[in-house]
């Protein structure tokens, strides 16, 4: 039997942008997978109307997951932490459970405690680096994952990383402490994980294995800090609007591109900020220092070096 066939029944918990897009991607790029969706009644009804689910549930969780081969948790971080114990109790022994949360340290640590004594059940941390500034099932897209990186944090590849988190000094700077590369563990060879990796490839994403702390450090700088920078600039400009709509009345495409992330709702970011606040706090301090340095260079040609570095980073970003 092909490893892909180990995953015939998928239960998706949360059918917002990510969960809904994953369901639509399964529909478009795989064959023969039965999709069950669990969420609020109106949301799962919409998912079924869009063809993203064969079977829908709201309310009690057990019926939605008790026959699943893959349980895909696409819920907010706090909700995921609350629901993990119930998933551990009611998921079948053969099931692979994975999440799509934007931070990983707390999720992986909780899952290790819950699933370590649950027989053959397996948890695999995940984070698809895909999204939009708009949320909800109405904005779900079967092609959302194409060309993106899919971060994976497995149990055996994150233990040492999380031990480092537990035993590090409280005063340690999360940005100056070196990020740790995690050893490869046997979780990669588990047939269920192999099957899930095949699904990731079919929906167009590239897997990247790393540790939980390493993940949160990287996304803190590359994803969460840019969001806060966009919020800061947008709220600053909002506070300086005059009766003629200036300065926004003279804004061009550059400002719209820069502030695209400012359209994201706080409800999407609340849990992310709370669970990655140490990295973000340190990152904001260093970023504020960089802004001070730029201000001091305004009257000199020294800004050229900063522009050159920015150009190189932009070129590098386009290569990923």
Residue map of PLM features:
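Rossmann-like NAD(P)(H) cofactor-binding subdomain of soluble oxidoreductases
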Residues: 86-138
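Phosphate-coordination loops involved in phosphoryl transfer and adenosine-cofactor binding
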Residues: 6-9, 94, 147
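Interdomain hinge/lid region at the active-site interface
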Residues: 244-311
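NAD(P)+-binding Rossmann beta1-loop-alpha1 motif at the extreme N-terminus of oxidoreductases
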Residues: 2-59, 63-66, 70
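Rossmann-like NAD(P)-binding element
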Residues: 61-91, 95-98, 102
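Internal alpha-helical scaffold of NAD(P)-dependent oxidoreductase catalytic cores
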Residues: 145-165, 174, 185-260
């Amino acid at each position: 039997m092909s490893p892909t066939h180990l995953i015939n029944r998928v239960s998706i918990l949360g059918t917002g942008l990510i969960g809904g897009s994953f369901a639509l991607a399964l529909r478009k790029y795989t064959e023969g997978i039965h999709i069950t969706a669990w969420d609020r009644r109106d949301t799962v009804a919409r998912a079924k109307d869009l063809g993203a689910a064969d079977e829908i549930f709201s309310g009690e969780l057990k019926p939605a997951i008790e026959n699943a081969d893959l349980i895909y948790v696409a819920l907010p971080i706090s909700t995921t932490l609350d629901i993990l114990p119930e998933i551990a109790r009611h998921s079948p022994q053969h099931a692979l459970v994975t999440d799509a949360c934007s931070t990983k340290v707390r999720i992986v640590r909780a899952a290790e405690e819950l699933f370590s004594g649950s027989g053959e059940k397996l948890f695999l941390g995940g984070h698809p680096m895909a999204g939009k500034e708009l949320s909800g099932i109405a904005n779900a897209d079967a092609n959302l994952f194409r060309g993106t990186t899919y971060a994976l944090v497995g149990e055996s590849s994150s233990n040492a990383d999380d031990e480092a988190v537990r035993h590090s000094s409280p005063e340690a700077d999360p940005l100056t402490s070196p990020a740790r590369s995690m050893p490869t563990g046997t979780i990669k060879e588990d047939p269920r994980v192999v099957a899930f990796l095949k699904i990731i490839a079919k929906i167009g994403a590239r897997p990247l294995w790393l540790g939980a702390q390493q993940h949160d450090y990287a996304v803190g700088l590359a994803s969460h800090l840019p969001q806060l920078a966009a919020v800061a600039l947008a709220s600053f400009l909002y506070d300086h609007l005059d009766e003629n709509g200036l300065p926004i009345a003279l804004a061009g495409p550059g400002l719209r591109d820069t502030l695209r992330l400012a359209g994201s709702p706080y409800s999407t970011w609340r849990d992310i900020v709370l669970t990655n606040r140490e990295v973000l706090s340190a990152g904001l301090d260093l970023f504020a220092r960089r802004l001070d340095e730029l201000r001091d260079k305004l009257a000199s040609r020294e800004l050229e070096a900063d522009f050159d570095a920015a150009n190189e980073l932009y070129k590098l970003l386009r290569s990923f």
